[in-house]
């Protein structure tokens, strides 16, 4: 939470965090729609530029400078990833209720009042937006579906809960999330390890206002690895189970070979191709397990070495800068 705000500035009722990346064509419209929805409430909008290469940072800076403190612009020094940007934004929020939505207009701000109402009515900690008609590209939909299946195994989340980027949460969750000091933040993983008071609400999913999706196979893979290795030791347990299964199959195979050599076909020599295939198989499994262990150790090394979650270049709050 920032301590540089003006003392006489009113505490907002709602804070809205928007990670920004190459969205100069849509961010103005998103901010305008938010103001139209919450015209009667005191709100705080936190725009976090995650190393955009277009003029998104300049657009966000202009919005913040003319907002009388209602918009906070956080500029990161480079691209750290969406979840790091969200974490940076959450650390600047002040309101008792906080929302996170995308910068492309696909998460309609008009859905936020009903999501906040659901949060309060059911006394939940987090409410996710459940997209009724997803407008994502087919590639993104496949990646999201796979990510959801993996999350069912890796994270302690309720079955059927869709972990979307469109969500609202209370202050308790925000305060717990910003305590995380590791170098690879995964917001939904932090939420699931903090609480089981999670819900979802059907919401609209709009087409992009401008541009194209910034998600690529590399970004989706990186996100999946953060969830797969950063918030669970299930992969290590699975490799142990895999080792036991292979050992059991090897014993069965050895018994079968002995029976074959002693009683069925004692004069037939075992094939070299079979032996080579087994060596290649077991070598591949060993390298996979070693690579996974190495990834865990590498993450521990980076955490101990002070790998930053994000680096803030500048913060603009109305007429003040820091």
Feature map (PLM): residue ranges:
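Hydrophobic helical membrane-anchoring modules
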Residues: 2-11, 186-322
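Cell-envelope/extracellular polymer assembly enzymes that use nucleotide-activated donors
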Residues: 13-15, 44
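Short, well-formed alpha-helical segments that are part of the catalytic scaffolds
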Residues: 23-37
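Conserved donor nucleotide-binding strand/loop of the catalytic core
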Residues: 43-46, 57-92
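A conserved acidic beta->alpha catalytic loop
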Residues: 49-58, 105-106
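Acceptor/aglycone-binding surface of glycosyltransferases and processive sugar-polymer synthases
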Residues: 74-78, 82-92, 109-190, 206-225
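Catalytic metal- and UDP-sugar-binding loop of GT-A-like glycosyltransferases, i.e.
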Residues: 76, 101-103
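Short aromatic/hydrophobic "clamp" motif used to bind/position activated sugar donors
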Residues: 98
């Amino acid at each position: 939470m920032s301590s540089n705000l003006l003392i006489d500035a009113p505490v907002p009722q709602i804070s809205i965090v928007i990670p920004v990346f190459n969205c100069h064509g849509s961010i103005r419209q998103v901010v305008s729609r938010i103001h139209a929805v919450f015209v009667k409430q005191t709100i705080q909008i936190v725009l976090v530029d995650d190393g955009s290469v277009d003029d998104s940072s300049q657009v966000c800076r202009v919005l913040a400078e003319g907002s009388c403190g209602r918009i906070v612009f956080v500029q990161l020094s480079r691209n750290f990833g969406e979840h790091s940007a969200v974490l940076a934004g959450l650390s600047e929020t002040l309101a008792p209720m906080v929302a996170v939505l995308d910068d492309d207009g696909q998460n309609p701000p008009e859905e936020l009042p009903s999501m906040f109402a659901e949060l309060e009515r059911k006394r939940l900690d987090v409410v996710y937006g459940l997209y009724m008609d997803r407008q994502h590209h087919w590639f993104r939909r496949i990646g999201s579906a796979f990510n959801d299946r993996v999350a069912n195994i890796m994270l302690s989340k309720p079955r059927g809960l869709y972990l979307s980027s469109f969500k609202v949460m209370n202050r308790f969750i925000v305060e717990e999330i910003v305590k995380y000091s590791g170098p690879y933040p995964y917001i939904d993983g932090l939420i699931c390890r903090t609480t089981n008071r999670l819900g979802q609400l059907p919401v609209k999913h709009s087409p992009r206002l401008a541009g194209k999706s910034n998600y690529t196979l590399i970004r989706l893979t990186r996100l999946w690895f953060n969830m797969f290795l950063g918030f669970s030791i299930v992969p290590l347990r699975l490799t142990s189970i895999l080792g036991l299964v292979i050992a059991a199959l090897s014993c069965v195979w050895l018994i079968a070979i002995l029976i074959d050599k002693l009683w069925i076909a004692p004069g037939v020599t075992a094939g070299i191709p079979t032996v080579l295939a087994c060596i290649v198989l077991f070598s591949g499994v060993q390298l996979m397990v070693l690579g996974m262990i190495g990834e865990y150790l590498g993450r521990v090394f980076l955490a101990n070495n002070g790998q930053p979650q994000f680096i803030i270049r500048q913060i603009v709050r109305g007429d003040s800068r820091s």
